[in-house]
Design a protein with these regions (language model features):
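Residues at secondary-structure transition points
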Residues: 48-56, 73, 96-100
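C-terminal structural segments of small proteins and small subunits
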Residues: 86-128
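N-terminal first-folded block
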Residues: 18-67
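Intrinsically disordered, low-complexity and often Lys/Arg-enriched segments
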Residues: 1-17, 128
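Glycine-rich loop at the start of a catalytic domain that most often binds anionic cofactors/ligands
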Residues: 80-85
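Small/polar loops that bind or transfer phosphate-bearing groups
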Residues: 21-22, 70-71, 93
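Flexible, charged surface loops at secondary-structure boundaries
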Residues: 11-14, 61-63, 117
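Nucleotide phosphate-binding site architecture
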Residues: 76
Length: 128
């Protein structure tokens, strides 16, 4: 069963969670998450940010107040150093098939979304 972990600092949030799916994750993951979990999700390509560097993506996320779904620890480091927003949904299950990724997210994302809605700046979902 996937583990869901969070940081110790919370930030207030008064709106629904909007997810941006990082470029190293499958682009179709955005539609899958949106359909399965009834949450707004977009991949970076659809947002015109596929070739942007992490600092540019972080700045755009900060302006929008959205959540990045990423395997990239750089976003975790930036939020830890600079503070939220954005929030980070950090997927640490390694390189897995889409099927395994869907299984991990199906088990961990409901609790992860609740933590994000309650202001957790960093939520980790792993396949363990």
């Amino acid at each position: 069963m996937p583990a869901v972990c969070c940081s110790s600092h919370r930030v207030p949030t008064g709106r629904g969670v909007k997810l941006w799916i990082d470029a190293q994750l499958p682009p179709a993951l955005a539609a899958w998450i949106a359909d399965r979990f009834d949450v707004e999700a977009s991949n970076l390509d659809a947002l015109g940010l596929r070739h942007a560097d992490d600092a540019q993506i972080f700045a755009a996320l900060r302006d929008a107040g959205n959540v990045i779904v990423s395997k990239d620890e750089d976003f975790v480091d930036m939020v830890t150093r600079l503070g939220p927003p954005p929030q980070v949904l950090w997927v640490t299950c390694g390189n897995v098939t889409n099927r395994v990724l869907h299984t991990v997210l199906s088990a961990g994302l409901p609790n992860g979304l609740e933590l994000l809605k309650h202001g957790e700046p960093i939520v980790e979902i792993s396949g363990e």
